[in-house]
Amino acid sequence: MAIGYACLNIGTPNTNIRSVMQRNATAEKLTEVITHNLEALEKMVDYNIANGIRLYRISSDLIPFGSSPVNMLDWPETHKEVFDRIGTKIRRGSMRVSFHPGQYTVLNSPDEDVVARAILDLAYHDKMLECLGVDNKNKIVLHVGGIYGDKEAALDRFAENFQRLPESVQNRLIIENDDRLYNSEEVLELTNRLQIPSVFDNLHHAINPPPSGGDDRYWIAAAAKTWKARDGKQKIHYSQQAPGKRPGAHTDTIQLDTFQQFYNQLDDPTIDIMLEVKDKNLSAIKCQNATTANPRPVLLEKEWGRYKYAVLERSPAIYQAIRTLLKDKETYPVHELYRLIDTAFAEELCPGYAENAAAHVWGYFKKHATNAERRQYEKNLANYRNNTGTLATMKRQLFKLAEKYDSDYLLQSLYFYLE
């Protein structure tokens, strides 16, 4: 089993994916952004390997205008060396990667121009996977598309246009149920017709269930039959509904108890689970730690090291409770740890607590800082106290000091990344 996350990474410096406005998309600018994005991807792949994450969805924005005539660069050849290097890391790390083209990639549109662009976009995604040198177990996820007044005709049109795709794209394509138009049963019928895999999404299913009924367990088992050996391990999507938000809105983090209940009822606990959640890799590690076959206290201590100053600035009481919790090296209190962390992040930020946490972080530098750096810190602190400055300003200085003084421990701290 692998538990993964999508596109962006929280807490790893310089992993943002950049974009380009069309009016600025010169060859020079495109090359600059592609180079940056590939460097960011490599950092995220390195992070995944270091943290045992073997399932990852790459951003479709990796190559700006990758399927458009706006980008006429021979980017596969120009960046071949870095693609090869990243692909080698992915394969050696037993990582499975995927793409999920966006809402404008619609294969069943009645508009031929839209379909033509969709075919080009799917070919672009396939080309990126080809550049990485990964096999057909690394997939491209797509929704069916629109209904256009006639669902049966729309499904037929998808099937017809599927045959127009290059064989390499057909071999990678998998179809997901959505939260409005095509339910689990309809997607399953289509994928059986095309002999390609079906991806079950639990939240979409909860919002848009088929009239025939059936719980998650039933439809996951049904979808499993569409996955052949050549496709790799069955993959599903898992997310939780954000309270008070529109149906389908994802939570900030995965509530572990709810996930554990879902996981425990799976017939096959070895399937791959792609999390769709706002805190990305943080929830992936949370769920990994809860389901690992080798529960070691060091796993929790490692994660606590990243969270602790972010927790301290919200609740010193919870900070102390977690320190006490982890003192017992004979237990593995994964659920209690994350329950306490989630409780801390649900609390309002208190200026006094934030000042205390900043002082702890400043303590890493005060023996090395120059007089100018010390004066700047004291000025930022005074401004924050009298409401003429912000906590963000103080944190920016502390982050720059962490970079200057090579404090890798602090650079990995979620104190700088979570609000």
What do the predicted segments below correspond to?
Residues 1-95, 105-108, 113-118, 127-134, ...:
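Alpha/beta catalytic barrel-like cores
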Residues 152-156, 177, 181-185, 200, ...:
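Polytopic alpha-helical membrane-helix bundles and their juxtamembrane interface segments
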Residues 97, 173, 198-201:
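Residue-level marker for buried hydrophobic side chains located in beta-strands
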Residues 106, 149, 182, 207, ...:
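Conserved protein kinase catalytic core
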Residues 124-193, 203:
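Eukaryote-skewed repeat-based solenoidal scaffolds used as protein-protein interaction platforms
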Residues 195-202, 292-297:
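Short hydrophobic/aromatic-enriched beta-strand-loop microsegments
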